[in-house]
């Protein structure tokens, strides 16, 4: 068996096209285009790349993208004041603050200051809590994107044993909640987990998000399992690899996300979907 690649680039383009059609219909109906505010503090090169891709994606689908590039010397008070301003801006449907933030700024304070109905990253405790209670509104982008990928490939989740490796607030924890909602029996593994291999070997679906190259040996993957690799790591050679040993895993899996071109593009596609949802549901007068 050789696994079928799950093509995140293709699916993300489909999602963007669907959103672009909805934007066009809104504008033709005399309604304003959705607006996204993207806030970058400091000059972290990786953050600049991510922010650039998000801004381009917005413009492609017809959103109004407002950019706020702040110096690394920006204080927490100044950043919170900007968020207050954006919360009150009737033409902004989503507020995205690129993480990580410089030392001296508490990311929790910042994320909690964003109005839950403009929290298009899905990080606000209110939105995570809604997901936990099975009534999601704005959902965390990477886990939402993964669910979209699995859905578009008609991969049945109900009744499957899913193992999530990694327990971060951005991916692992909300991913666990998404999989519970989808009907999986879900195990979350983290740095204190004993016998990681034993857990992975039992999984019908493995989602790995630890940020360590080739962390999960391909031979651990059960025959016919689905592998979702969230990691993106650059080796000294310059090659990009995931958190799973791809070539070996592909011999056992039924479906696998490649790196690059798997999960990555779906994160931005989900951000676009969330902004559209916020605009239609929360900021359009019925």
Swiss-Prot record:
Transmembrane segments: none annotated. Pathway: One-carbon metabolism; tetrahydrofolate interconversion. One of its GO terms (molecular function) is methenyltetrahydrofolate cyclohydrolase activity. The keyword Hydrolase applies. Belongs to the tetrahydrofolate dehydrogenase/cyclohydrolase family. Catalyzes the oxidation of 5,10-methylenetetrahydrofolate to 5,10-methenyltetrahydrofolate and then the hydrolysis of 5,10-methenyltetrahydrofolate to 10-formyltetrahydrofolate. This is Bifunctional protein FolD.
């Amino acid at each position: 068996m050789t696994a079928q690649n799950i093509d995140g680039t293709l699916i993300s383009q489909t999602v963007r096209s669907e959103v672009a059609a909805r934007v066009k219909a809104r504008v033709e109906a005399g309604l304003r285009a959705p607006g996204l505010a993207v806030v970058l503090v400091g000059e972290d090169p990786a953050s600049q790349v991510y922010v650039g891709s998000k801004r381009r994606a917005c413009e492609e689908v017809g959103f109004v993208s407002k950019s706020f590039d702040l110096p690394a010397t920006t204080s927490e008070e100044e950043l919170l004041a900007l968020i207050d301003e954006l919360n009150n801006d009737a033409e902004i449907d989503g507020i995205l603050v690129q993480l990580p933030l410089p030392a001296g700024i508490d990311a929790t304070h910042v994320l909690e200051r964003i109005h839950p109905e403009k929290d298009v990253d899905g990080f606000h405790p209110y939105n995570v809590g809604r997901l936990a209670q099975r009534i999601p509104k704005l959902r965390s982008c990477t886990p939402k994107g993964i669910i979209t990928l699995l859905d578009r490939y008609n991969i049945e989740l109900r009744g499957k044993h899913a193992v999530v490796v990694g327990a971060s607030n951005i991916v692992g924890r909300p991913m666990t909640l998404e999989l519970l909602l989808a009907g999986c029996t879900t195990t979350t593994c983290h740095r204190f987990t004993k016998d990681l291999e034993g857990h992975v070997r039992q999984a019908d679906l493995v989602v790995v998000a630890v940020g360590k190259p080739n962390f999960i040996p391909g031979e651990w993957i059960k025959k016919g399992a689905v592998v979702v690799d969230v990691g993106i790591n650059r080796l000294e050679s310059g090659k990009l690899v995931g958190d799973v040993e791809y070539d070996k895993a592909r011999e056992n899996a039924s479906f696998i996300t490649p790196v690059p071109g798997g999960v990555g593009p779906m994160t931005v596609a989900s951000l676009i979907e969330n902004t559209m949802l916020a605009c239609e549901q929360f900021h359009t007068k019925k």
